[in-house]
Amino acid sequence: MSRAPPTRQVDIDGVVSRLGALFSEGKQDAALGEVRALLTLLLNDNQRLTLDLARVLRRHLQQTSEKISPAQLALLLDRVDVKPPAPPPPAPSVAEVNGALSAPELPVRKGHGRRTLPAHLPRIVKRHEVPAAERDCPCCGEERKLIGYEISETLDFVPASLRVISHEREKLACRTCDEGGIAVAPPAAKLLERGLFEAGFIAQVLVAKYQDHLPLHRQRAIFGREGVELASSTLSDIVGAAHEALEPLAKRIHDHPLAAHVLQVDDTGIKVLDKDSAAGAVRGHLWAMLGDQRWASFSYSPTWEAKWPFALLSTRRGWMQADAYAGFDAIYRLGNAVEVGCWAHARRGLFECVEAGDARAAVALDFIQRVYAVEAEASVEGLNPEQRCKRREERSRPLLDSLRAWLIQQHGQAPPKSPFGRAVGYCIRQWEALLRFLTDGRLPIDNTACERALRPIAIGRKNYLFAGSETGARRAATIYSILGTAALARLEPWAYLRDVLQSLIDGWPQRRIDELLPPAWALAHSTR
């Protein structure tokens, strides 16, 4: 959230004196004009503060959802004079599509009844025998025979454990002449020259830090409870060595989003310690690039200047979905990347207005909810890109044409610096980009998939608070790229990283590095 301007100070006595002077001079119109101007300024301040308060409360209460119930929407629409047009042919209700996004289809959630435990988990059978007093038939006295078992399952947890791998290198000597010297088997390859750590241990450190958001000092304490004392610098060296080994893999991942049919881009800030900074730290940025929702690449920049995304994205040709960050404009002006707007960003400003009590924004939200309903319906029906594009043209375009007419009407009435005026202005300025999803059925309606890719970074940031250096931030970008792409391929992160690290330690040829990329690895292991 941007820093709010200071609260406006009003000299009430001065205002009264000024108005009194104008009235005494017979300048009633001028006095009324000044009153109107002052009230407009104060109203804008009030709306801004109400909006800021709503944002702070949502963050404090950790309410990240932007859903609005059908009942809320109906009540808000009753408070405004302008009503949206009748809905198009039947589509899912607002309740069914509230928060419907363009993510890949996930397994359908089951109800709240007892769920079957995953089949891949190991089973330990515990037999429970009928008590001796009940083993005989109460009617005839004969012993009852076993006819089967009534089975129920409970979930147990076995704490993760460390183990020591003892490498015994064969030593051979000649017993006959005793002059041929001793032959010793070569040592096993290691990621760290003098390291004591297997690929599984290194993978655990990486997954714990970057997937489970566990800082190194907490990992050190966990290992210490097992009697293994490790210096923080040792764990840091492990991360550094893993980064060096995995960097070629991350670079190959980086190429795929740029070549994808749909490129989605977003960024988030990260605090980086800097001894040369007066504050002791600087705000760097991690840029996320999502390619066809299969590839996730992250890059670090020390500032938010436009030159950094330009260096990353200037070679892009084709669709590029992002927010309205002005730093992307130079990329679009090259004429190769085509801007695709994000309806989640457009909706967010309007939702915040409703949250702050401005009922006018509910009209626009109603239009947008209906467009999302069309998307949800297309997903449920499993439409292919061509069919989805046709459905959008038939159902969504008329809704958006009506929404644009309403936005233009409101734009002429709302103060441009008010929260509602800014939300409406954003939609109008971005309108051409916001309509692009209508032209290609493979384009998502919003950029929330990329926002989700950044979520682990936001969660991790709350735990480790900062990167220790710019080098550490770049290491994080590398590991996030690999783990993020592995997550999109639905891979278990530790198993994948352990196998890849072991392959690299064993001398995997760089010319075959693509075989270790998450989609290729998933395919190879699914056929075993």
Regions from the PLM with identified roles:
Residues 1-196, 264-265, 271, 527:
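Short, flexible loop/hinge motifs at secondary-structure junctions
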Residues 41, 48-51, 55, 248, ...:
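Residues on one face of amphipathic alpha-helical coiled coils
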Residues 134, 138, 217-315, 379-442, ...:
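Gly/Pro-rich turn-and-neighbor structural signature
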Residues 146-148, 182-185, 272-274, 297-299, ...:
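Short helix/loop capping segments that flank catalytic or ligand/cofactor-binding pockets
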Residues 199-212:
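Short, amphipathic alpha-helical "recognition" segments used to contact nucleic acids or chromatin
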Residues 262, 324, 335-366:
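Conserved beta-strand -> loop -> alpha-helix junction used to position metal-binding or nucleic-acid-contacting
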Residues 317-318, 324-327, 366-528:
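Acidic/histidine-rich catalytic cores and adjacent linkers
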